């Protein structure tokens, strides 16, 4: 587990540097050109690194296994209200469609992470995560 954790840590430090460079370049370009820009990074899965159980790898039963990072930046002021909001990966489609200006039948602002009307829905998962907030009404 220690070797896996060290390898994973090194990979994450490298990824963080790449993401920093991409976001910095995106922000600088948006500011220079005045072009409305949205930048998003969403991991495809979590990774257990021995924090909750004595194993490393994919896990659907520990927070390290099902929590994933979301990085979101927009040159528009409106999406900044999304800071520190909980987000579920299955809510990515409404967010991306909204950012692209695409509307659809049965569109619900409550599902759009960047909307002022967004409402968090706690996922129905078998694993226990005491840090997940309850659903918003």
Locate each region found by the language model.
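Catalytic domains that recognize anionic headgroups
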Residues: 1-137
């Amino acid at each position: 587990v220690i070797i896996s954790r060290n390898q994973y840590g090194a990979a994450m430090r490298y990824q963080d540097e790449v993401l920093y460079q991409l976001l910095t370049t995106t922000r600088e370009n948006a500011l220079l050109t005045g072009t409305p820009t949205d930048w998003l990074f969403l991991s495809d899965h979590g990774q257990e690194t021995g924090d909750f159980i004595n194993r490393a790898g994919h896990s659907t039963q520990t927070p390290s296994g099902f929590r994933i990072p979301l990085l979101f930046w927009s040159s528009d002021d409106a999406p900044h209200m999304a800071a520190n909001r909980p987000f579920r990966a299955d809510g990515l489609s409404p967010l991306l469609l909204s950012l692209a200006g695409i509307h659809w039948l049965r569109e619900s602002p409550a599902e759009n992470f960047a909307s002022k009307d967004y409402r968090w829905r706690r996922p129905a998962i078998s694993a226990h995560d005491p840090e997940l907030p309850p659903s918003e009404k």
